[in-house]
């Protein structure tokens, strides 16, 4: 089996001192199809059949979610930083491993798969799931490329987050 982790580069002190950044750029450049295949395999055929659309979190989540949406014939929903989507939007503040932000999405309906690149502290995933529900969606599943759980106290009261790679 292909070791996708070997294509991820560790960058110390980025984007700020004390952060170890997992750079997925080499993985996407060299093994994009295999990466999407690994993410796709996190759900079985029955689970995929229940998903109406795939929500990708800005910005690397867009890359993964849009490719999955194309592969599975699903809609694609943007979850963006504040001020990047035209109204109407629903917004929610959230915490990052190195700051604060506000996520927004346009209102809608349907059953969503949430996709992001990394599970670190869980702040972005918690906010995205809550935001999606406020915007009118039902969250069925959540997947990430990398699970690096920086917060050992991370709690998720939904179906488990599935990850292609664990650190």
Q: Residue ranges of each PLM-predicted region?
A:
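Active-site-facing substrate-recognition patch
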Residues: 1-50, 106-108
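PRPP-dependent phosphoribosyltransferase catalytic core
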Residues: 4-7, 126-167
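Short glycine-rich phosphate-binding loop at a beta-alpha junction
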Residues: 49-58
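Conserved acidic residues
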Residues: 51-52, 110, 140
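Generic enzyme active-site microenvironment
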Residues: 56, 114-115
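Short Gly/Thr/Asp-enriched flexible loops that form oxyanion-binding sites at enzyme active sites
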Residues: 63-72
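Short, glycine/charge-rich flexible loops or terminal/linker lids adjacent to PRPP-binding catalytic cores
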Residues: 74-113
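Acidic, divalent-metal-coordinating active-site segment for phosphoryl/phosphodiester hydrolysis
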Residues: 116-129
């Amino acid at each position: 089996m292909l070791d996708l982790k070997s294509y991820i580069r560790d960058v110390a002190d980025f984007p700020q001192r004390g952060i170890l950044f997992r750079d997925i750029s080499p993985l996407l450049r060299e093994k994009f199809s295999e990466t999407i295949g690994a993410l796709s395999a996190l759900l079985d055929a029955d689970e995929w059949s229940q998903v109406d659309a795939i929500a990708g979190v800005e910005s690397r989540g867009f890359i993964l979610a849009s490719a999955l949406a194309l592969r599975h014939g699903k809609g694609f929903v943007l979850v963006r930083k504040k001020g990047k989507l035209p109204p109407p939007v629903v917004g929610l503040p959230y915490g990052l491993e190195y700051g604060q932000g506000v996520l927004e999405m346009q209102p809608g309906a349907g059953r969503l798969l949430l996709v992001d690149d990394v599970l670190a502290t869980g702040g972005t995933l918690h906010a995205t799931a809550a935001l999606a529900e406020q915007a009118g969606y039902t969250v069925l599943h959540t997947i990430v490329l990398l699970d690096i759980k920086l917060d050992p106290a991370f709690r998720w009261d939904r179906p488990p987050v599935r990850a292609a790679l664990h650190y």
